[in-house]
Structure formats: structure tokens, C-alpha cells
Amino acid sequence: MEKEKKGARELDLLDIVQFVAPGTPLRAGIENVLRANTGGLIVVGYNDKVKSVVDGGFHINSAFSPAHLYELAKMDGAIILSDSGQKILYANTQLMPDATIHSSETGMRHRTAERVAKQTGCLIIAISERRNVITLYQGNRRYTLKDIGFILTKANQAIQTLEKYKTILDHAISALSALEFEELVTFGDVLSVLHRYEMVLRIKNEINMYIKELGTEGHLIRLQVNELITDMEQEAALFIKDYVKEKIKDPYVLLKQLQDMSSFELLDDSILYKLLGYPASTNIDEYVYTRGYRLLHKIPRLPMPIVENVVEAFGVLDRIMEADVQDLDEVEGIGEVRAKKIKKGLKRLQEKHYIDRQL
């Protein structure tokens, strides 16, 4: 598998947390060690750098099981697993990292874990004997796994926040859609909706972290998120395609740049203008016209390639609305039936958003 080829040492934080999430054999073994109050040190991955810090121990090379991990953790030394975590390679080893590597930890086990992680780049799992805490180290990163009850509480709070922000976003999008049909959208409206999309996506990403950490316990949270914001990334990407200055093939690149921004950058209009390809001095009250990707995509059973062809042919939503059935029929991939469907679909959306705006 691709993930096994990469090795645990190359995984990002979400993957690392999922690697030891409830429901995995590794987490089951770690929980056994926690309950026994023996503590432990586990290295995931074995390469030349790991070899250079390992001393002693004995070769196991057997399939991983929670019971084996529990028994081997009774000994003082570290346990070394394969990159995939599916094999126990060595047990009762002594780890001797470079003592000059800075460590902010105080306990011997955690100090060793931090130094080995920095020196080797591998995932190191330190199980505290007294505090019943699981700490993950990889490179310069440190992450303490939290109690499942605590994570569930935080996840449910985040779900409630997501619901509120999603409601605000829905109102903003509905108002924007009405303005799009009336050709009254300003750059201020665009930036406002862009902010709201990003806030919803950030909350979703935070909840995804909780879901990964919860493992099998996060199933209901995942269902709630999926029900709340299905296809949110796609809608945000189409919104960007509607308003970016120059046409782009992959709006997800800009969406990723948006999500990588700090909270301060997100509040800076000039940075958002630059992201969309406009001058930083753009007037917030200046009118801007949608291409129509997002609204056309809302018409049932209208494939994205057809949406692309329509926008390519007419340029902006206003011209699409002005086009008659014959004009639409001339677009590649659109026959008379589909042309009528587009006209009726846009008319229905226009009426819906007009009514929503009056409520």
C-alpha cells in the first residue's frame, strides 16, 4: 500500500493521529500498557538513523498484536516496530540519541523520545507510567493524545459552532445569488462570502482532526459533518472560479492557499484581492460579475463539462440569462432538451433566491 511505502515517518499529523486512533491494533496495545501502569517507548520505523541510536535488545521480527506489545512493554527497553506498524522488529532496546539535541522534556523517557524523533525523523510514542498520557513525537513535532471523552466533548462543541456558521454562510450565499441575478454584486460581497466559506472549512478541518483521533469512536461525528457540509469544498472552488480575475483550470490550488492563510491574512482585503488576481487598491464597492459556474452547477443532472462549455460560450451569467434556447442549443454538448432545462433551471433558481431575500 502507498502509505506503507511512505512509512510512518513521512506521514502528516492527521495520519499520525489516525495511526494510533481507537480501533487500531496499535492503540489497543498502547491502552493495555496504560492500564498496566508500566509505561513504554515505541519507535515506528527502522532505518539507518534508527540503527545508529539503538543499543542492545533482541530481535523479534514477528507479527504485531496488542498482547505481544503489552508483554514486551513489561521490560524496560524500547520496542521497535516496522514502518507500517504491522511487525514487532526489536524489543528491550536501549535508545542512545545525541545528548546535545535540545529537549524541553523533563522525564527521562520523554526526553529520549523527543531526541530520537528529532534525530531520526521517525514516529516515537512515549507512554507515561505515572500520568497515563500518550505523547507522540515526530521530527520537531510533539502531540499529546487526549482522553476520548474530552475529544468527544470538543467535537460536539465544534459541530454546534459549525451549524451556526453554516447557517450564516447559507444566508450569505442566498443573498449573493439574488444579487448575481440582478448584477449588483460588489467586491465587498465577494470577500464577505469568501470569508464565510473559509471559516466553515476551518471548523470542518478542526473536526476532521477530532474524527481522526477518535478512530472508530468518531463515526457519528463524521456522519453529522457529512450531512452538514456535503460538497462544501466543491462549492467554494466554483465560487472562486466565478470571481477570479483570470480563468483557471484548478480553483482548488487557490482554495488551498486560502486555507493556508493565517487569521490575520484572512482579514486583509488586499491579500484576498491578490489571491483572486485583482489589484490591492480595488474599490470594495466596485461591481463585479459572476461567470455562473456555481449557479449552473446547482441545476440537477447538468454535468460539469457542460457547465464549462456554457460559461466558455457566454462568459458571464448575465449573457447566459439573456441567451434563448436556440443560442444555448448551439453550445457544444447541449441539445434542445438540455437548453430548455438550463433556462428553466436558472429561472427557478432566480425565483427561489428572490423569495428567500424577501423573507
From Swiss-Prot:
Reaction equations catalysed: 2 ATP = 3',3'-c-di-AMP + 2 diphosphate
Cofactor: Mg(2+)
Keywords: ATP-binding, DNA damage, DNA repair, DNA-binding, Magnesium, Nucleotide-binding, Nucleotidyltransferase, Transferase
Residues at which ATP binds: G77, L95, M108, R109, H110, R111, T112
Superkingdom in the source lineage: Bacteria
Entry-linked InterPro entries: DisA, DisA_sf, DNA_integrity_DisA_N_sf, DNA_integrity_scan_DisA_link, DNA_integrity_scan_DisA_N, DNA_integrity_scanning_protein, RuvA_2-like
EC number: 2.7.7.85
GO biological process, one term: DNA repair
Matches recorded under PROSITE patterns: DAC
Residue ranges of every copy of the DAC domain listed in the record: 10-148
Any GO molecular function: ATP binding
SUPFAM superfamilies named in the record: RuvA domain 2-like, YojJ-like
Keyword Nucleotide-binding among record annotations: yes
HAMAP family, per database record: DisA (MF_01438)
UniProt function note: Participates in a DNA-damage check-point that is active prior to asymmetric division when DNA is damaged. DisA forms globular foci that rapidly scan along the chromosomes during sporulation, searching for lesions. When a lesion is present, DisA pauses at the lesion site. This triggers a cellular response that culminates in a temporary block in sporulation initiation. Also has diadenylate cyclase activity, catalyzing the condensation of 2 ATP molecules into cyclic di-AMP (c-di-AMP). c-di-AMP acts as a signaling molecule that couples DNA integrity with progression of sporulation. The rise in c-di-AMP level generated by DisA while scanning the chromosome, operates as a positive signal that advances sporulation; upon encountering a lesion, the DisA focus arrests at the damaged site and halts c-di-AMP synthesis.
Subunit: Homooctamer.
Annotated family: Belongs to the DisA family.
Name this polypeptide is given: DNA integrity scanning protein DisA
Highest classification ranks of the organism: Bacteria, Bacillati, Bacillota, Bacilli, Bacillales
Gene designation: disA
